[in-house]
Amino acid sequence: HREPMLLVDNVEVDGDWVNATYTVKGDEHFLQGHFPGMPVVPGVILCEIMAQSCCLLISDLLKENLPLYAGIDKARFKHPAVPGDTISIRATVTQRKGKVVFVEATSKVNDKLCCSGNFSFVLIPKPNNN
């Protein structure tokens, strides 16, 4: 991902897990109108932040492949993220079946759980750009 869709500021990968962060600046396009007078990061954007972190975790598999969302299971939204918050993401690969990778992820603000879910990605070959 690249701007304006890059939603990871910092990342630390250690084998089976990734820790990543994103600081909500307040001027992001997805905050406009969500909600007037009380901007809150939309749940789908929290999921995107976690998904991007998951892809950083499996980056070794992405040299020749692109990860496409296959699904999000058990997504739960517990606490809002607002401008000024730093969202911390932790993700772990739970299983791999052929070209499908399963990852469990959580996002937190100040140790309060914002969102959790089980993500699956299907790896497809990168197109040959010759």
Report the location of each language-model feature.
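Non-catalytic linker/capping segments at the edges of enzyme domains
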Residues: 1-36, 40, 65-66, 78-82, ...
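Active-site helix/loop of acyl-thioester processing domains in fatty-acid/polyketide metabolism
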Residues: 11, 41-64
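An amphipathic alpha-helix/helix-turn recognition signal
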Residues: 15, 45, 49, 100-102
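Hydrophobic beta-strand-centered segment that forms part of the acyl-chain substrate-binding groove
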Residues: 53-90, 114-122
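Beta-strand signatures of extracellular beta-sandwich domains
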Residues: 104-106
